[in-house]
Amino acid sequence: MKKKLFILTILVLTSLGIHSQTIVSTSPENKKVVLEEFTGITCGYCPDGHAIANNIANNNPGNVFLINIHQGGYANPGNSGFDFRTPFGNALAAQVGANFYPSGTINRNSNALGRGSWNGAANTALGQSSDVNVGVEADIDVQTNTITVHVEAFYTADSPESNNKLNVALLQNNTIGPQTDYANGNTTEYNHMHRLVWLITGQWGEIITTTTAGTFIDETYTYDIPNDYNGVPVKIQDLEVVAFITETQLDMPSGSGTFPTYSNFSAENNARPTSVEAILPQCGFDITPNVTIQNFGENDLTEVEITYSVNGGASQNYTWTGSLLSLQSETIQLPAISYEVEDVNTIEITLSDDDDNSDNQISENFNIANEHTTTVNMILNTDNAGSQCTWDIMNSNDEIIYSGG
């Protein structure tokens, strides 16, 4: 982590144009809420906690920020392959006595609370004045996977503590994985949101040594995002940043959050196929392939010509239209295509020319279905008028191969 820190104390009567704040308000504001929820993939009541937290955030847009900390026994991945734990979770839980799940804190101003208390505690905090305002923005270089986080803070009143700490949390959304759920049934397709993956400023944050009214904090961090955390892949398009100040290691007067922007694309217009949905073994019937495309360009993607064929046979074309922002993806079901079946079959998909054609193609293999020969015994149970019953057995071409009656 690299950082650049600038602190400027301003006289109360100084013109606002003298200092360089750009993303933080200098007017007194009420507290923003940071809800840190302690959770786990085998915690059956945790989905209810997630829903409660999401409702609080949705009811207070721009004023409530969620951090889901996977920690404790319920976060043990077992054989699932989804280890959402971090090096920071145990210490965060220990300082607030989070030994039941789900539990959480509102601005770290109490011991861990049960989910039934979160809404009331959040409303109380939102009604209190804050002595500091926080603003944050972030950008990710898509070539290097480096995130740059810019945080500003402005003290509108003296902090009760001579030293404060600035914290920057990196979160990941939309991670599909397992979750025990007592209300809706266990699933392997749960959408995990606001998942803490890293604390860019370390366990307890960076020290702020001047905390009097008029103090302006301007800090920039850079952090190289890895390909995965504990084997769980990182998707940079799903990342989120929450910045907050604590008076010690507890008691947050305020915080803020943002979704990163993205820069340094290799091309302005670049669509690429990222995956083809697995195709089950086939008997030679027409298939309807599903392909996922991603906008890996700087400009919005609104149209793509898709050409596809199987086993080198006749190609078909399909034109997709829509709207994808940079790094967004969409799965497209292509119209059915016929082919000459082989033992191993290959579908090839190519996107239309754009600014970078090096990533415009993808292929996927699928097998012929196994054939078996065996004896089939058919028992036909009739009523008292059995002579009126007839039967037919037909093949895949709707031809009658056996009949009776």
Predicted segment positions?
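Bacterial Sec-dependent N-terminal signal peptides
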Residues: 1-27, 283
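Local sequence-structure signature of Cys/Sec-based thiol-disulfide redox active-site neighborhoods
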Residues: 24-65, 69
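Short, conserved sequence motifs used for protein processing/export or organelle targeting and
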Residues: 55, 62-271
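Short, solvent-exposed loop/linker segments at the N-terminal edge
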Residues: 140-145, 278-286, 300, 369-372, ...
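Asparagine-centered strand-capping/turn motif at beta-strand->loop junctions
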Residues: 155-157, 292-297
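Short acidic/proline- and small/hydrophobic-mixed sequence motifs that coincide with surface turns
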Residues: 160-163, 298-303, 386
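Terminal connector regions
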Residues: 240-254, 339-370
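Intrinsically disordered, low-complexity Pro/Gly/Ser/Thr-rich segments with frequent PxxP/GP/PP motifs
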Residues: 313-341
